[in-house]
Amino acid sequence: MLAALAAASEPPAHVARWRAQVDWEAAQAETVALLSAYLQVDTRNPPGMEEVGASFLGARLDAEGIPWALLPHSEGRASLVARLNATNPTAGPLCLVSHLDVVGWEDERWPADRGPLSGAIVEGSIWGRGALDMKGMGALELQTMILLKRLQVPLSRDVVLLALADEEVANVGAREAVDRYWDQIGCSHAINEGGLGVKDAIFDGESVHGVSVAEKGILWVELIATGRAGHGSTPYPGEAPDRLRDAMVAIDRMRARPVFDETMLDLLDAIGRTHGGATGAVLRSPFLVRTLARKKLMNEPATRAILTDTIHLTGVYGAVAPNVVPSEARAMYDCRLRPGTTPGAMLERLREATAHVDGVRFEVISAAESSASPTDDPLFRALVRYAVEGRPAAAAGPLLSVGYTDSMDLRRKGVRAYGYVPFEVTAEDAETMHGHGERVPVSEVGSGLERLFSVVVDVAAAP
């Protein structure tokens, strides 16, 4: 309901006033060129070496007279912070967050004329690793800072640009920003990655924009089985591979219970209002969602992952040769935990499920609890409003992200962090994140810039 009310509300007058002063065609062209060049900077992680990416952004900031600083954490690796100051601040600083690093790739899987470091503009899209995750957002945020500075928009709160290192591997950049450099950041609110707009997400001709207000916790574990070693020609009881198999079967039989919380129900309500009719009425009714729509939602992998704690087998290890029985065999699990489930509670469930199998134990690789920010906040309402402004076939609402981002560390400081990349793309384009042929439509660079600029002016500019 909150999302629907936010989407229906009119933008403040000062937003329209400042938007009218922007040449949006020129701003899109400038941002497209910026993103194309940014994608050509190699910051794949590992090894990272994000300082070259930070310096690239810093050169653009220098050209506009916006002060910035490196936040180093190891040789060749650094984050960047820049700031536009409010004259008489009436609210805490707003932070525009992105990460400098990108995941690796397989060169042979990309088209020859639009490779991962090309920044090529082909078939109406900008191609390159990071176009969606998340150099595209970084380019929008930098261009928003540039527009604020050029137009001399009077600010009611500081606006901070924070481009972080090492999001894709260990989140060291975010942790160090919070633990070592917070005096240079000190924000109360943040816009980061998380949700985005997807065309035809549920119904043909209708798009859904999820604004992430929470992220699932994690428990990464290894299941380790030990037992008798020997020759493959003669099976014996108590061998490690057999014990591992039995424990894995027990884990596979664990049943997840769906949770229809306020976040999911509010998003479904927004989708239902947009779609209308009998189906829309079902989506707007919590009772009908739990009864009539439950089966369909649980059968879709994407919504099932939101509704439940997930236990995902991601690897099995131990074999030496076909005729050798190893004394140890391992399986790796990625567990993603809804708010309300702690890593300790999930670990206990795993132990209980496998208690009947001798010679098995769990080792924790990494663990973190879920984190969340409230929907009753002006920044969340602004993100929802401009995601769908002027487009009756678009719905926006809160989202529980199944992955985790640097927002998890920001929330440790009490920051209200929301995840929304203001692009609207096809499901096919969205699936290129971390995949082959990552790209973003040129038109969405312009639309996304206007959405983000509108949000920032709404919540950070003096009326």
State where each predicted segment sits.
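Hydrophobic h-region of N-terminal signal peptides that target proteins for export
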Residues: 1-8
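Short, solvent-exposed loop/turn segments at the edges of secondary structure
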Residues: 9, 77, 91, 114, ...
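Acidic/His- and Gly-rich active-site-bordering loop/insert found
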Residues: 10-131, 148-157
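Short glycine/proline-enriched loop/turn "hinge" motifs that connect secondary-structure elements
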Residues: 28, 110-111, 153-154, 212-218, ...
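Solvent-exposed loop/turn segments at secondary-structure junctions
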Residues: 44-46, 75, 88-89, 100-104, ...
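An extended, acidic, His-containing surface patch that forms the Zn2+-binding/catalytic region
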Residues: 89-91, 105, 198-199, 257-320, ...
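Acidic/histidine-rich catalytic neighborhood of metal-dependent amide-processing enzymes
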Residues: 125-126, 132-210
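A short core secondary-structure module
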Residues: 176, 180, 228, 233-257
